[in-house]
């Protein structure tokens, strides 16, 4: 052993910087944005990331001789400049598939964004994108039902789904909460939603909410003749309680439940998605806490990665921002991760932030959910950006209507159908948005009042996290 093993510390780049390596189809590929400490060569920083996120440690160890390090190690195979940023660079790293447990997003993230993010040689580190190989994708369950099945279950075709979050999101009793749900659904919405932080608080225990909401949904269905639904948030203190809530929602014959996938965790989310698949339930996903992770342009995980991981872990709908509302997200970036939620193949396109080709095979797609600070004036832009396979959710833009939630729901429904009709007739709905909405308002006093109420409301703030393109 002494002839083959040299104790001590050697530079990471001696082992993990392999510029001649050609990635395999079965490799998991990752793109990191790296900002190293002053004086540390790029190759050493990039190799350190590859090492610490795969097989390496700070010292040479004798037990390397007990395995095939050349087979298992991560390899940094390319370094690129970041446009407009002299401090940072992109490091492209290939990981052999055998480093990861089959179907486990939890395991993938534990490796790629684990201890390496606290590495002293780095000032900042951001995971920009992942190329999941088909060999890994085939081990993941993915969306419990997917876009096509969800449309069939809800009997909604040819337009986006229309919904809203119940407001105020905290403080209502179960009965009053159910009353608001009923008003929204009878007014014309397809779906209503628990907010992310409604679980089972003293003012409203989860079982009361579920029962009153189920009553409201069924009454609205009887009155309108349409299929209605409400996202019942099953996020809970323990997995056991989460499944208990899901089972009760099923007993009440509710079509869809909800989970906060980042705060709840990927293990819980994958388990709940598997349960939904077996029990014929739809699963709505909220992304609470995402901005803590993805908003800093140099450190963390880009949301496109979190969106890809959700499609693999399982969810039928995912919040993606709005572009035009109150939440962060520019148009091209948002379209980039919407593509990865819905399409079967997404090509590399740096103008949309996609660093790799991504083949999703036959995995079902996920509805993109636009929610946060939107109202009727935004409807043409939302339809143009998100298309039909989306869910447009107006919280304040429903409940803030001067005539109440039912009128707000009616205004949104009329606005949506007017925009869809105009688009189908070949009109440029973004350029002609005012004419389309004002024309529809002639036949809808609810829409006319909504247009007047929100005519001055805009959220014109610059995006913090911008695409690195010139």
Swiss-Prot record:
Q: Where in the cell is it found?
A: Carboxysome
Mind telling me which residues the site (Transition state stabilizer) is annotated on?
326
What the entry lists under SUPFAM superfamilies is as follows: RuBisCo, C-terminal domain, RuBisCO, large subunit, small (N-terminal) domain
One GO BP annotation is:
reductive pentose-phosphate cycle
- Active-site residues (renumbered): 167 (proton acceptor), 286 (proton acceptor)
What is its cofactor?
Mg(2+)
Main localization of the protein described in the UniProt heading = other
Q: Which residues carry this modification: N6-carboxylysine?
A: 193
Annotated substrate binding lies at 115, 165, 169, 287, 319, 371
**EC number(s) on record?**
4.1.1.39
Q: Which reaction does it catalyse?
A: 2 (2R)-3-phosphoglycerate + 2 H(+) = D-ribulose 1,5-bisphosphate + CO2 + H2O; D-ribulose 1,5-bisphosphate + O2 = 2-phosphoglycolate + (2R)-3-phosphoglycerate + 2 H(+)
Would you say which domain of life the source belongs to?
Answer: Bacteria
Which residues are noted in the entry as Mg(2+)-binding?
193, 195-196
Give the UniProt keywords, A-Z. Bacterial microcompartment, Calvin cycle, Carbon dioxide fixation, Carboxysome, Lyase, Magnesium, Metal-binding, Monooxygenase, Oxidoreductase, Photorespiration, Photosynthesis
Q: What Gene3D superfamilies does the record tag this protein with? A: Ribulose bisphosphate carboxylase, large subunit, C-terminal domain, RuBisCO large subunit, N-terminal domain
Whether Translocase counts among this entry's keywords is no
Give the GO molecular function terms. magnesium ion binding; monooxygenase activity; ribulose-bisphosphate carboxylase activity
A GO CC annotation recorded here is: carboxysome
Name the NCBIfam families on file: PRK04208.1 (NF003252)
> Any other comment in the entry?
The basic functional RuBisCO is composed of a large chain homodimer in a 'head-to-tail' conformation. In form I RuBisCO this homodimer is arranged in a barrel-like tetramer with the small subunits forming a tetrameric 'cap' on each end of the 'barrel'.
Q: Which family does it belong to?
A: Belongs to the RuBisCO large chain family. Type I subfamily.
Q: Can you state the subunit structure given in the record?
A: Heterohexadecamer of 8 large chains and 8 small chains.
Protein name per the record? Ribulose bisphosphate carboxylase large chain
Species name:
Prochlorococcus marinus (strain SARG / CCMP1375 / SS120)
